[in-house]
């Protein structure tokens, strides 16, 4: 048996999962979720801002204490859309390595969807002909199985991005709503 930790550095939140792995099966021991807003203002600046980095690093510090207290043997740290799309992701990867001794790996949208699919499939026996929709802050992954062939389609559309670009007034104007629907239709048709 091996005790592992996965840190999912998403566009809006950073998650921690600690599990025991034995014979290819997971026994989940602990799950944590913290809002870090890595993608805050990413659309405007094309980079992850200082406030976002501070929140993110604070959460990583907290998670590493939890990992140490749980005798974890292996840690996997994954970055998704915000880190894929930011101009300063290399700087953040270097910071995470030097400050926390973690190798932050940025994965593609397709890899993200594939890993999501594996996670969902592990919760069900004989899952066939399904559709999984993973809506993130900056991207949405569609994972679907047709006749035992798994397919992944990653779209650059997420809740934070839609909020910042199209739905940023309260109440939402008719024009904003129309623009949001047009963008949504363009992405999925």
Residue positions per predicted region:
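Nucleotide/phosphate-binding catalytic cleft detector across ATP-hydrolyzing
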Residues: 1-9, 17-132, 143-189
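Conserved Rossmann-like nucleotide-cofactor binding loop
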Residues: 12-14, 138
């Amino acid at each position: 048996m091996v005790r592992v930790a996965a840190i999912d550095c998403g566009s809006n939140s950073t998650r921690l999962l600690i599990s025991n792995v034995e014979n290819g099966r997971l026994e989940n021991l602990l799950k944590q979720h913290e809002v870090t807003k890595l993608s805050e203002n990413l659309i405007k600046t094309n980079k992850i801002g200082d406030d976002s980095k501070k929140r993110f690093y604070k959460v990583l510090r907290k998670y590493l204490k939890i990992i140490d207290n749980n005798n974890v043997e292996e840690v996997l740290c994954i970055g998704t859309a915000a880190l894929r799309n930011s101009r300063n992701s290399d700087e953040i990867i270097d910071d995470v390595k030097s400050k926390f001794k973690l190798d932050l790996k940025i994965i593609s949208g397709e890899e993200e969807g594939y890993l999501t699919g594996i996670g969902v499939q592990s919760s069900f026996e004989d899952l066939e002909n399904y559709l999984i929709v993973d809506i993130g802050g900056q991207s949405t992954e569609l994972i679907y199985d047709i006749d035992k062939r798994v397919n992944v389609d990653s779209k650059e559309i997420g809740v934070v991005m839609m909020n910042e670009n199209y739905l940023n007034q309260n109440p939402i104007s008719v024009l904003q709503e129309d623009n949001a629907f047009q963008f949504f239709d363009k992405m999925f048709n």
